[in-house]
């Protein structure tokens, strides 16, 4: 097992909402999360103390962050400061996003 190149089965997989699955890989100070959203699935409004930045890598979704709403597609990036309410609704194509959290989200380990 390599410290630098994780195996495909390393990390953890969770269904966080119906139709929304995450695959995570923690480091000492941050966490990588691959979020796969089925068509029309929803990440319900929530907030957390972690900073979050991300990029849509496939499909498209409506992001609502701090009351501001925007449709984001492949290559679009976003940032969610600590404590800011946010939600995501996948469109008909579904969506895949890559998120980075700081610090590590213990609830996703």
Please provide the spans of the model-predicted regions:
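Glycine- and acidic-residue-biased ligand/ion/polar-headgroup-sensing regions
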Residues: 50-61, 66
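Short, surface-exposed secondary-structure edge patches
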Residues: 44, 53, 68-71
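Structural motif
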Residues: 31, 60-62, 69, 85, ...
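Ligand-binding loop in jelly-roll beta-barrel domains
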Residues: 82-107
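A short, N-terminal "cap"/entry segment at the start of jelly-roll beta-barrel domains
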Residues: 1-29
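Conserved short histidine dyad/triad with adjacent acidic residue
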Residues: 33-47
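Short acidic-glycine-tyrosine-enriched beta hairpin
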Residues: 68-82
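Histidine-centered active-site/metal-ligand motif
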Residues: 46-48, 52, 86
